Design a protein with these regions (language model features):
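RNA pseudouridine synthases
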Residues: 1-184
C-alpha cells in the first residue's frame, strides 16, 4: 500500500509526537505505514508512506535514482550563468551533487500553489521566481544547499513529484492524503 500525503509546512516526518511540531500522526490515521524518505519540516508537498519495507528502501535510497521533482521559490532574478551551476556537478562540501534538470515555472503553473501558513517573508525590493528542480539523490537539504550555492536563497520548497507520482495529478489538498494508485 502507498499513501500520498500533501505535507504542510511545519510538520515533522515522524509519527511519534514532537514538542515543537505537528507529526504525521496528526494527518494520516493509518497504522503501520512509514515515510518512504523524508521531507524537511520547513518543506512542503508530496510525501509517500508505505507498509512495504522493500518499496520504502527503493524510494528513499539514492542508488535507485528515482527522480524527485521540486518547485522552489528563490530569491533574486533568474540568471542563465548562475542557473547553469545547478545543471553541473556541484560541490556542496560533504558531497558533490549530481547535475539537476531545471526549468523556470510560469504564472499558470504557480497559480496551483496554495498559500503557506505562515506566509514567507516577502521583500518588495527583492524579486523572486519559481524554478522546477529534478534530482535523483535527495540528500539532506540538498535542493536548498544547491540553490544557495548558485546564489539563490530558497524561500519556499515544495516537492511535487516522486518518480511517476505527481502531487497535482493526484489532486490532494494541503494536509490531505489518499491511497496512491500508481507506484513511483
Amino acid at each position: 500500500m502507498f499513501i500520498a500525503l500533501n505535507k504542510p509546512y511545519g510538520v515533522i516526518c515522524q509519527f511519534s509526537p514532537h514538542e515543537k511540531h505537528r507529526s504525521l500522526k496528526d494527518f494520516v490515521p493509518i497504522p503501520n505505514v512509514y515515510p518512504a524518505g523524508r521531507l524537511d519540516t520547513d518543506s512542503e508537498g508530496l510525501l509517500l508512506l508505505t507498509d512495504d519495507g522493500r518499496q520504502q528502501a527503493r524510494i528513499a535510497n539514492p542508488r535507485f535514482k528515482l527522480t524527485k521533482t521540486y518547485w522552489a521559490q528563490l530569491e533574486g532574478s533568474p540568471d542563465d550563468e548562475r542557473l547553469a551551476l545547478l545543471q553541473r556537478p556541484l560541490d556542496l562540501g560533504d558531497f558533490v551533487a549530481q547535475p539537476a534538470r531545471i526549468r523556470l515555472l510560469d504564472e499558470h503553473e504557480t497559480a496551483r500553489i496554495w498559500q503557506r501558513d505562515p506566509p514567507i517573508r516577502v521583500r518588495k525590493s527583492v524579486p523572486d521566481f519559481w524554478l522546477q528542480i529534478q534530482i535523483c539523490e535527495g540528500k539532506n537539504r540538498q535542493v536548498r544547499r544547491m540553490t544557495a550555492k548558485a546564489g539563490y536563497p530558497c524561500l519556499r520548497l515544495i516537492r511535487v513529484g516522486i518518480g511517476r507520482v505527481n502531487l497535482f495529478d493526484l489532486g490532494i489538498e494541503l494536509g490531505q492524503w489518499r491511497e496512491c494508485p500508481t507506484l513511483p
